[in-house]
Amino acid sequence: MIELAVIGGGPAGLTAALYAARAGRSVAVFEGSGFGGQITLSPLVENYPGLGAVSGMELGDRMYAQAEAAGAELTFSRVQRIERNTDGTFLLETEDGAISARAVIFAAGAKPRTLGLPGEEALVGRGVSYCALCDGPFFDGQDVAVAGGGNTAFEDALFLAGRCRSVTLIHRRKTFRAEQALVEQAAQRKNLTILTDMVITDLHADNGELEHLLLKNADGRETRLPVSGLFVAFGRVPDTEMAAALAERDQEGYLLTNDRMETAAPGFFAAGDCRHKQVRQLTTAVSDGTLAAVSACRWLAEQ
């Protein structure tokens, strides 16, 4: 029996483990894909206070090392199921066996929806991005495209239009899911072009960097769009299915918490991109992890 199990080894989970371990709690972090989370895919991180410019991989490695040095047990094993024991503790079934914990911090994150095109994954960090706020500054003065038709796509396009030479928003339908006010704002930007009834069929790279997109309209006609950046804004999918029986979720599947990261289930906390919130950034994930750990430690002390 451990005191605290953390599911997910990204910035939120590693921060939670760091704080809980420093508070003297026995902590185990379970991660099935790779410690550090999605930030490790970023070639350069410039918006984490105090570090200047650092690669995402180096930042993830530093977080891992710091949590481990504090005394957290970091286990490369995927949690497959969580259930509540009759005594109120939690049973976690992992790839390597079962373990019980008095409290759980769920920080499994959320994955971006992709285009699903060949070569897309290889171009992440080399022209393809799923976060305009994170990576937009790397494309100042360049020609970029945004794929999507919802609020996020238009917000990204407007943000990028303020710093890029040109922005092309590409949507597969004639109508948008975005609020009309955002659509009207985008239509007024001189360096922002909106293409409808259009899909991206191919990503062409030159020397490993995105060079142009191949587009196809409803009539099957293909066109070539030269861009150095593509921001895919199809939304994200939270990895919360295994927590559905324990905690409440919103319509998109994100876990609902209060400002102390507590879910409706006593002793079950959530942190990072998997929970319902307005902004999903590296710094907000770290903040969530801190709050979740402090709340979990207080909860453990009260039991």
Placement of each model-derived feature along the sequence:
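FAD-binding core/adjacent interface of flavoenzyme oxidoreductases
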Residues: 1-7, 23, 28, 74-142, ...
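Beta1-alpha1 glycine-rich phosphate/pyrophosphate-binding loop at the start
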Residues: 2-70, 154-179
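Residue-level detector of alpha-helix initiation sites
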Residues: 10-11, 34, 110-112, 150-152, ...
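Short amphipathic alpha-helical segments
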Residues: 17-18, 41, 116-119, 157-159, ...
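A Rossmann-like FAD-binding core segment of flavoenzymes
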Residues: 67-94, 98-101, 162-259, 298-302
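FAD-site-proximal beta/loop scaffold in flavoenzymes
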Residues: 116, 122-138, 234-281, 288-291, ...
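Conserved FAD-binding catalytic core of PHBH/FMO-like flavoproteins
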Residues: 135-162
